[in-house]
Regions:
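Domain-scale activation on soluble regions of proteins
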Residues: 38, 164, 171-172, 474, ...
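Alpha-amylase-like alpha-glycosidases and glucanotransferases acting on alpha-linked glucans and related
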Residues: 4, 12, 18, 56-194, ...
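Catalytic domains of carbohydrate-active enzymes, especially glycoside hydrolases
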Residues: 27-52, 287-288, 438
Length: 502
């Protein structure tokens, strides 16, 4: 079957324009969908929608299933009558339209959402009751987890009192009674998130725009998932990790990356027929049209680092579940659209797993000319892209195209010019030639980060791996979505046979 050529834009929900401190499911999100349609795009790729924790990373969430309350539209709550426009306008979310001030966001949004809950009379809402019943398999544990975390002043669950840390039944019953209204508050937030996200996704689909969601391979240690299902993770009898996730040293990081996530106890998953993973992916496809799985190579082999290590250096490779997991998923769910994030260190067995799965892998232009790459740079040259792949200029973890070109070596810049056969275009405009380069590649799908279409520098970078403090903050300004840019994107998308004519 011939694969339809298509294109899309990568923009996190958090990066949408908004007067309330962070991008959310407000009118600006609907306007962006309309803008995507006018540019001829087929896909809107986003980052994980989970509840963020310390460091604000969407890849370290308190739950694999819960949504981020920061994305709840305050305007929609005003329309419901549980907030007033004056209350929202009075809140101080920070002064910069292109930045997210998470400390202010935590205080101001939290206050407003609690106010909305107090006025909601949610206990008499039949839709809320139905939502709670339908989702109780994850919602009950998550809401209790968040309520107890509040009682213990935000401490990770492995530092809670022993009775609730180990989920002894008397303690579970006690906290459910003691924290009843706090538990209901967290259920209310998930209800509003779910309601608003499904409405936005339905609107996008009605305009011919499909959503590419993103899930991390691992859950966070401090998550409701690890607390509620300790037997599925490599934890000891006291529910403390024995080993954690990361990646080994390479040309980009001399000590590797220590992520700290608990590793899966794959034999326990296998014994259940991979039910937890099947359920997780089923739920993802309730929310998204296509799912990108981060760190796909971890299903072939995963890097195991002894708990307590200061760097990833002492780690070693362990065998993962391989294709068996995805055969079980396909048997349960049928064929689904998954993108395998197969970047980084690649072995022959990882490549074979991607081939066996049939999922498209990822091709990132920036990796094609980088001397720090560990030997597979030619895989990322656009003339080598297979049809069954998704081409990117860069991802949320990369420098923007403009800054990347400025920071690579003279020799690498010469390689770019030679490959483009372009010696005349000024440096500051060369990003357009690079975007056109991957748009005309054979890859069936091509996704361009919004910052690259805008020609922005690293001030608009989403994330710099292995750093904390200044990540996940960039926001798009509404004035940047110009008619001129819209026309330019549409022309290039059409020229290379990727326009969505729906």
């Amino acid at each position: 079957m011939k694969m339809q050529r298509s294109a899309g834009i990568l923009l996190p929900i958090s990066s949408l324009p908004s007067p309330y401190g962070i991008g959310c499911f407000s009118q600006e999100a609907y306007d962006f969908v309309d803008w995507l349609k006018e540019t001829g795009q087929t896909y809107w790729q986003i980052l994980p929608l989970g509840v963020t924790s310390y460091g604000d990373s969407p890849y370290q969430s308190f739950s694999a299933f819960a949504g981020n309350p920061y994305f709840i539209s305050l305007d929609a709550l005003v329309e419901e009558g549980v907030l007033t426009a004056a209350e929202c306008k009075k809140a101080n979310f920070g002064r910069k339209a292109d930045d997210i001030d998470y400390s202010r966001l935590y205080a101001e949004r939290g206050r407003l959402l609690r106010l909305a809950y107090s006025r909601s009379d949610i206990g008499h809402n039949e839709a809320f009751t139905a939502f709670c019943e339908k989702n109780k398999w994850w919602l009950d544990d998550f809401a209790l987890f968040m309520a107890v975390k509040g009682r213990f002043e935000g401490k990770p669950w492995i530092e809670w009192a022993e009775d609730i840390r180990l989920r002894w039944q008397p303690a579970m019953d006690y906290y459910r009674r003691e924290l009843y209204f706090e538990v209901e508050y967290h259920k209310y937030l998930q209800f509003k998130f779910d309601q608003q996200w499904r409405r936005l996704k339905a609107y996008a689909n009605s305009k011919g725009i499909r959503i590419i969601g993103d899930i991390p391979i691992y859950v966070a240690l401090d998550s409701a998932d690890a607390w509620a299902n300790p037997g599925l993770f490599q934890l000891d009898k006291d529910n403390i990790p024995t080993a954690v996730a990361g990646v080994p040293p390479d040309g980009f990081s001399p000590t590797g990356q220590l992520w700290g996530n608990p590793l899966y106890r794959w034999e326990a998953h296998r014994a259940t027929g991979y039910q937890w993973w099947i359920t997780r992916l089923w739920y993802c496809f309730e929310l998204y049209d296509v799912v990108r799985i981060d760190h796909f190579r971890g299903f072939d082999e995963y890097f195991s680092i002894p708990y307590g290590s200061e760097t990833a250096a002492p780690g070693h490779w362990e065998k993962g579940p391989g294709i068996e997991l995805f055969r079980a998923v396909e048997q349960a769910l049928g064929k689904r659209e998954i993108i395998a994030e197969d970047l980084g260190y690649m072995s022959d067995t990882v490549r074979q797993l991607v081939r066996d799965s049939g999922f498209p892998g990822m091709k990132v232009l920036e990796f094609a000319f980088d001397s720090r790459d560990t030997g597979s740079a030619s895989d990322y040259l656009p003339h080598n892209y297979p049809v069954n792949s998704v081409a990117y200029t860069g991802t949320h973890d990369n420098e923007t195209l403009v800054s990347w070109y400025q920071t690579i070596s003279d020799a690498e810049r010469a390689m770019v010019r030679d490959y483009l056969y372009d010696y005349a275009t000024p440096d500051e405009q060369l990003y357009k030639s690079m975007i056109a380069l991957i748009l005309r590649s054979a890859a069936a799908r091509c996704i361009i980060p919004m910052q690259d279409w805008l020609g922005l520098d690293n001030a608009a970078r989403i994330n710099k791996p292995s750093t904390v403090g200044q990540n996940w903050r960039w926001r798009l300004k509404k004035t940047q979505l110009t008619k001129k840019l819209q026309k330019e994107i549409c022309q290039l998308t059409t020229r290379y046979g990727r326009k969505n004519w729906a």
